[in-house]
C-alpha cells in the first residue's frame, strides 16, 4: 500500500474512532447476506443477546463457525424464486422484530453502456433490489409482518441520483437506486399500516469480500449501524444516511 493510500485510510478511519456500545438485546433479527462482510459482523455482534435468522446464498461455513442456539441459518439464493420457500418456512414460524438487509453484489466488472450484460443485470437486480420486497410479501401473506418494528436496508451512495457525477457502473447504480426507491416506498406504506420504521444506510468504504481494498473494518461498521438504528436519540425513519447520521440525497 502506497504512502498516499495509507494516509487516506488513516484519515478515513479517524471519523470512526468513537466507540459505539451495542446494548441491543431480546430481539429477533433476520439478516440477509449473513455469511460474509457486514452481515456476518452484525450476526456475530448480535447473536449473544438476540435471536438471528441468518440468510445466506451458498457458503454457510462462516455461519457454521458461530456456535449458538440463537442462530438459525437459512439458504436462499435470491436469484431463484423457488428458494424463497426455504425462507418462508422459517419466517412463518419465527417472530421477526428487525430485518437488516445486507445482501448485495456489484455485478460484472465492466459496466459501461456498451458492455452491459443484461443477464447479469437481472441477477444483480434480484439480489440488490427485489429480494427485500419478496421477503416482505411472504411476511405480509403469513401475517408475521405485524411484529416487524424496523427494516434496515444497506445501500450505497452509488445509488444516489443527485450525487452521480461519474457515470458508468450501470448495473450497480441502477439496482441500488431501485433499492433506495423501494426503501422510501416502504417507509410510507409500512409505517402507515404497522408503524414499521425503515432506514436506508450507506456504510461507506468498508472492507468486505466485494470491496477487499476498503478502508473501514466491517466490525466497526456494524457497531455504527446498530448505534444509528437503536439509539433513541436518532430520528432515522424514512431517511437515506451515512454512518455519521448525515442525510444523503436520494
Residue ranges of model-derived segments:
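C-terminal helical subdomain
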Residues: 196, 200-203, 212-250
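Catalytic loop of short-chain dehydrogenase/reductase
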Residues: 105, 109-125, 148-192
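N-terminal Rossmann NAD(P)H-binding glycine-rich loop of SDR-like oxidoreductase domains
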Residues: 35-44
Amino acid at each position: 500500500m502506497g504512502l498516499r493510500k495509507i494516509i487516506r485510510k488513516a484519515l478515513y478511519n479517524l471519523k470512526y474512532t468513537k466507540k459505539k456500545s451495542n446494548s441491543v438485546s431480546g430481539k429477533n433479527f433476520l439478516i440477509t447476506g449473513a455469511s460474509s462482510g457486514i452481515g456476518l459482523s452484525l450476526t456475530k455482534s448480535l447473536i449473544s443477546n438476540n435471536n438471528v435468522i441468518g440468510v445466506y446464498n451458498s457458503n454457510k461455513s462462516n455461519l457454521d463457525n458461530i456456535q449458538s442456539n440463537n442462530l438459525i441459518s437459512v439458504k436462499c439464493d435470491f436469484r431463484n424464486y423457488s428458494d424463497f420457500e426455504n425462507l418462508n418456512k422459517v419466517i412463518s414460524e419465527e417472530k421477526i422484530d428487525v430485518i437488516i438487509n445486507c445482501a448485495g453484489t456489484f455485478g460484472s466488472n465492466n459496466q459501461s453502456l456498451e458492455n452491459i450484460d443484461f443477464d447479469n443485470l437481472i441477477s444483480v437486480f434480484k439480489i440488490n433490489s427485489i429480494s427485500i420486497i419478496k421477503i416482505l410479501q411472504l411476511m405480509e401473506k403469513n401475517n408475521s409482518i405485524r411484529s416487524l418494528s424496523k427494516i434496515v436496508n444497506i445501500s450505497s451512495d452509488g445509488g444516489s441520483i443527485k450525487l452521480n457525477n461519474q457515470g458508468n457502473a450501470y448495473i450497480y447504480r441502477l439496482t441500488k437506486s431501485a433499492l433506495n426507491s423501494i426503501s422510501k416506498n416502504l417507509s410510507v406504506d409500512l409505517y402507515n399500516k404497522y408503524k414499521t420504521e425503515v432506514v436506508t444506510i450507506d456504510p461507506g468504504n468498508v472492507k468486505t469480500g466485494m470491496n477487499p481494498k476498503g478502508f473501514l473494518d466491517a466490525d466497526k461498521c456494524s457497531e455504527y449501524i446498530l448505534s444509528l438504528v437503536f439509539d433513541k436519540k436518532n430520528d432515522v425513519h424514512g431517511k437515506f444516511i451515512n454512518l455519521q447520521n448525515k442525510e444523503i440525497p436520494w
